[in-house]
Amino acid sequence: MKTLILLIQFFTRIPLPVQINMDEINLKKGSALLPFVGVIIGAWNWLIFTLVALLMPLPVAIIAGLFAEIIITGGFHVDALADTADGLFSSRKRERMLEIMKDSRVGANGVIAICFYFLFYGSLFLSVPDTQQIGWLFFVLPIVAKGVTMLLFAKMTYAGSKEGLGSIFLGVPWWPVVIAQVIVLVALGAFFSYIGVIAYAGVILFTIIYRAFVYKRIGGMNGDTLGAGGQMGQLICLFCLVLLWGLI
């Protein structure tokens, strides 16, 4: 329970009135619970989307659902996506890329990445053939994002500074990664049957390609690339689901 509270405090803005000392060893072992942080985020997203959908048109409810995640996370990983785009696409050397990611200012690549991310994300939600599924998508996709993050933790080489937040998860054992994947697959299978499981295969393929690209550019992961990977992972999952629903 302490590990779950730490993970909630780490990945969300939920004000828990509990002070727990950071134990990196137990946090790494307990990282298998990370998808349950996705459950909490997803439940909040679902609630906001559902309430707004009762009063407003579907596009407005979708925007509200997307904004709900920014509220509960503080835009933590959206900022990481912008920083990653600014750094990796800066056409600079490794050291300079890492410096750019640390810069609190958002560059042109970051702005472009965020704009197209949400345009594509919103368009995919509007493309879901069964609108009754949209609420469940808002619930499940944050779980997928945490599953992708766990995949990126596996045998991770850390490229950031030793003081970086992502370094806490350096050396995560293999078994929490496997448990996290099982949780994600159960969630996708429960809500979207075999199509959800097939879609996650596409997410895993994306994660492998993304990981290889990042390692080639900066020699490993850092906090920004980890966060960006989770954000893009849930986008890819939605893309695969919409694609499969159109084909099957």
Curated annotation (Swiss-Prot):
The chain crosses the membrane at residues 24-44, 70-90, 106-126, 134-154, 168-188, 189-209, 228-248. It holds the Pfam family CobS. It catalyses: alpha-ribazole + adenosylcob(III)inamide-GDP = adenosylcob(III)alamin + GMP + H(+); alpha-ribazole 5'-phosphate + adenosylcob(III)inamide-GDP = adenosylcob(III)alamin 5'-phosphate + GMP + H(+). Its main location: membrane. Keywords: Cell membrane, Cobalamin biosynthesis, Magnesium, Membrane, Transferase, Transmembrane, Transmembrane helix. It is found in: Cell membrane. Its EC number is 2.7.8.26. GO terms for cellular component: plasma membrane. It is a multi-pass membrane protein. Pathway: Cofactor biosynthesis; adenosylcobalamin biosynthesis; adenosylcobalamin from cob(II)yrinate a,c-diamide: step 7/7. The keyword Transferase applies. It is an enzyme of class 2 (transferase). Its cofactor is Mg(2+). GO terms for biological process: cobalamin biosynthetic process. One of its GO terms (molecular function) is adenosylcobinamide-GDP ribazoletransferase activity. Belongs to the CobS family. HAMAP family: CobS. Joins adenosylcobinamide-GDP and alpha-ribazole to generate adenosylcobalamin (Ado-cobalamin). Also synthesizes adenosylcobalamin 5'-phosphate from adenosylcobinamide-GDP and alpha-ribazole 5'-phosphate. PANTHER family: ADENOSYLCOBINAMIDE-GDP RIBAZOLETRANSFERASE. This is Adenosylcobinamide-GDP ribazoletransferase. It comes from Listeria monocytogenes serotype 4b (strain F2365). The lineage of its organism: Bacteria, Bacillati, Bacillota, Bacilli, Bacillales. The gene is cobS.
